């Protein structure tokens, strides 16, 4: 961040195999690390942060856990995400939601997902082919602070449709409300109260304005 003279930015570390060997066997191949940083606004738009986004359930599904190491954040897996995202944008939506091979809700194309129903906040269990996101974990801690209980488990597609609130979490997406899924309005079609409370504290934390979570930050 300092090297690139940036104030607010996105940081992407990448670990990859070197050039000293061809083939599919990684043993003995040099490991390289690159870190990129660049200015980047709200991934799903400022309006998305404030008013919520429109999403669709993708025709593509997340990988089965026996196909690959689904809990790893590996570049090759993102072909699945690219297909889902491109399909959603082509059809006029902002983002997609993918189901797991059993038909349960997994995550967004690059984000974890939470829903609020009858006062209970729920998110898919990590057995649903989803990533154990850092922002997902951060929301757990924020919810403890707010005394909001979070339940991990299996979520069906129709639970999304009848939820009071739904939001996405991610390093790029931050906390982004969902106002519509498959042309069905979520709640009152606006950012929900619980989502707004979580979002407010999250942005206070990342900007260094929340004393309780100061330990999460590294000053530059």
Model-based region annotation:
Residues 1, 8-22:
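Short, glycine/charge-rich beta-strand/loop segments that flank catalytic centers
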Residues 1-2, 85:
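Generic structural signal for well-ordered alpha-helical scaffold segments
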């Amino acid at each position: 961040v300092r090297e690139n003279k940036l104030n607010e930015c996105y940081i992407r570390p990448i670990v990859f195999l070197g050039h000293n060997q061809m083939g599919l066997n990684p043993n003995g191949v040099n490991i390289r690390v690159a870190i990129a940083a660049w200015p980047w606004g709200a991934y799903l738009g400022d309006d998305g942060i404030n008013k919520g986004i429109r999403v669709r359930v993708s025709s593509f599904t997340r990988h089965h856990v026996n196909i690959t190491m689904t809990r790893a954040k590996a570049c090759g897996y993102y072909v699945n995400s690219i297909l889902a995202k491109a399909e959603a944008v082509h059809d006029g939506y902002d983002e997609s939601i993918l189901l797991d091979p059993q038909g349960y809700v997994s995550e967004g194309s690059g984000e974890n997902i939470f829903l609020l129903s009858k006062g209970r906040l729920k998110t898919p269990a990590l057995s649903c082919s989803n990533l154990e996101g850092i922002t997902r974990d951060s929301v757990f801690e924020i919810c403890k602070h707010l005394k909001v209980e979070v339940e991990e488990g299996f979520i069906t597609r129709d639970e999304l449709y009848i939820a009071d609130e739904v939001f996405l979490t991610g390093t790029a997406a931050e906390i982004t409300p969902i106002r519509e899924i498959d042309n069905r309005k979520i709640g009152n079609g606006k950012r929900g109260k619980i989502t707004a409370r979580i979002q407010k504290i999250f942005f206070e934390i990342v900007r260094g304005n929340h004393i309780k979570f100061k330990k999460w930050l590294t000053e530059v």
